[in-house]
Amino acid sequence: MPAATPSYALIVKKDCPTCALIEPVIAQLAARFASALSVYVQDDHAFPASFPERIDDTSLAYSYAHKIEIVPTLLRLHADGTEQDRIFGWDKKQWQQFTGVADLGQKLVAFKPGCGSKTLDPGMEAVLALKFGPQLFKARAVALADAEDIMEACFERGWSDGLPVVPPTPLRVLRMLRATTRAADEIIGRVPPDNVPCSVEKVAINAVLAGCRPEYFPTVLASVTAALQDRFCLHGLLCTTYFSSPVLIVNGPVTRQIGMNGGVNALGQGNRANATIGRALQLLVRNVGGGIPGGIDRATLGNPGKYTYCFAEDESDSDWPSLAMDRGFERDDSVVSLFAGDGLQGVVDQQSRSPESLAKSLALSLRTVAHHKLFAMADAILIISPEHRRVFRQGGWTKANVRDALYSELMIAGTEIVRGAHGIAEGMPEKFRDKILNKFRDDGLHIVSAGGKAGLFSAVIGGWVASGERGSQLVSQKF
């Protein structure tokens, strides 16, 4: 039984010099194969003029289905329309052998590379996947009336933290999901306080709302994974009347790859990655977990970090271990650490020129975390600026020396801090009167580097007064 005659499909676009070059070839193929040749045009349906039966593929449906990357592409098809083989670009001998037309394009140049398919235009892959690919989304679609303002609709539905959000359209969410290899329906964990199952898709939706770029998404996912660790005690943190909220410190190559700020104004405004990664976690807590102010969130005052509290560590000094390295990771690891912290407390010391003096000075500020007379209750982060770091470095001190000196300076006799001492009712219980106490538990003081190179200023982020095993501990997540 003779083999079935193959059919051919040619995909072209007018805006391609190589496609324009092979117009005579298209005419030859049409004469040879007649109805066995189909020509799909990605841009201008009037092209090619020599083949009036051309098929409009401006929707790119056919091109997407056949994964066309270069035009012209010539497909040889089985009788059922499935692909048998393909060639692309223009190579005279290859096309002659592929089609069996010995004189095909005889007067043309021997070779000319093809052009990029319109399916590869910037951003088009996600557009086509959304239009023609399998359905990925499990989240409920919200239809808006034509007269509804999309920005106001986000406020009215309670999706915002009080600032404008980016509407999470299917295309934006899909582009966010494309930034990870994890499945959209993978459950990361349950988000308190309502303990709602949280999928990768839900994280993506809130990352879009926060204004994240897709390349930030792995960091957002890692921060959510860290926040859901039992050691972090997110449920308790959300329910407390205290000031605290999640503080994110990011280490490793990712900070440079996505342009995070650990330098000038590191804890301030102006850096999109810093601002939106932290905000994504806060919005997720609100929109998925139900942690809404006035509801389960009954903070007496709160702090501005409940919008976003995220920064990169300055790792430019190779002799100074990063926070991630303190937690057992390597310098080349990308790591996000979460701390239950309050607002920022400035530390001014423009006079100390010796490590000993500066350590004593920093310790005085650290004593005031939560209250001068409350010890071993709240952890803290000490952010040391480059100029203060220089004082330690020039004095020959390592980070370990700084930590040891601070712990030594933070020891105090219980008689100084028990309730009623110095005429102040607040303080430690009477049972600590005859003890020597340290301001922080053994793993309660975390030293981080950040800030601009000008200014003898450092800072303290005080922790939740339920720090430690009874409440929240700093957690880290490699990604």
PLM feature spans:
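Iron-sulfur (Fe-S) cluster-binding modules
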Residues: 105-138, 145
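Short active-site neighborhood of thiol/selenol oxidoreductases, capturing the structured segment around
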Residues: 2-26
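Non-catalytic, surface beta->alpha helical segment in thiol-disulfide oxidoreductase systems
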Residues: 70, 75-111
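Structural motif
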Residues: 11-15, 40-44, 385-387
